[in-house]
Amino acid sequence: MDGRGLRPYMNTREDRAIRFLGLPTLLRSTGDDTNGAFGLVEHWSMPTGFASPYHVHHLEDEAFYVLEGELAFVCDGKWIRTGAGGYVFGPREIPHGFKVTGTGPARMLLLCAPAGFERFVMELGEDPDAPAVEPDIPKLVAVAAKYKIDILGPLPG
């Protein structure tokens, strides 16, 4: 342990798996692991056509690193397409979202700094072995507001 109270650790896909917005999701790091510095989430099997809502974070910045597949990101109304190895930064206070555009599933890491977004993910998380269901939008909006995230609606055209 160092002076900040942090310990090295490792996790596997089985350690902190949940289903978030119908997606198989893994909590790689939480604020508890990083002393509040960041949270790291892996969406490890996003189907073609999946789209996040257009939204704004007021407390944290988001960084997306695409591991597999093809995605389109929209940030402040501007679209960016990228594939494996692509990196997109979404600053707080700027509307953004993404959708899977390739012919197969996509996988990405989502880092939020400071930590906190992962608590939103955990609160909405479901049993990873349960079948995927459509998200409960009123619940999503209410829980997002608790974490200072505004859900603006579907992604812009």
Model feature map: region roles:
Residues Y9-N11, I18, E70, G77-P95:
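Short acidic-glycine-tyrosine-enriched beta hairpin
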Residues E42-P47, V56-V74, L111-C112:
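Short, conserved beta-strand element in jelly-roll/cupin
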Residues M122-G157:
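Acidic/histidine-enriched, glycine/proline-rich intrinsically disordered or flexible terminal extensions
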Residues M1-G3, Y9, A115-F117, G125, ...:
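Glyoxalase I/VOC metalloenzyme domain signal
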Residues A72, G83, R92-E118:
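Ligand-binding loop in jelly-roll beta-barrel domains
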Residues F50, H57, L71, Y87, ...:
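Hydrophobic small-molecule pocket/channel-lining residues, especially in calycin-type beta-barrels
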Residues D33-N35, M46-F50, A63, E70-A72, ...:
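Short, charged/polar surface micro-motifs in flexible loops or helix N-caps
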Residues A17-Y54, E60-D61:
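A short glycine-rich, His/Asp/Glu-containing loop-to-beta-strand
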